[in-house]
Amino acid sequence: MCWTCNINKLKAQIAKEDINVYKIVKKATKEYCISPFMDYTYYSKDIQPSLTLGVTIEPRSIFAKITEGYHSYSSVNFVFDSVVEGIFGGYVKTIQCGNRKEIFRVDNSLYLAIFIIPSGCVYFTNEEGEIVSNKIRYTGKYIKL
């Protein structure tokens, strides 16, 4: 998965304190959760190995991208009265992940898991409220979406 940001707004930050962030995962328990992308397993309370956040800017592009890092959202909000009939049948609901609205089937099998970017870690936030960080830790807290 690739994280992108307008190059004029690209800014590396260092977490001054632990930061609560959120990930959509396909399985969650108090002990671990599994990412739907790459099937990566995060174990509760373990800080994941540090990754180098390499920024790439293609010639004549206004976007920077980071291809390796721990992706998360700065916030998640459930949109009131957002359940509607989907165009392919069934019902869907809208959930605001960061600054963008995502549509999920009501009968989905996903979870919202709470993570922490530990104090002292490097992270970037884009215009959509998507975060990429060099370290992350699963708290063991989650809810069914």
Please place each PLM-identified region on the residue numbering.
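Conserved NAD+-utilizing ADP-ribose enzyme module
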Residues: M1-Y70, V76-L145
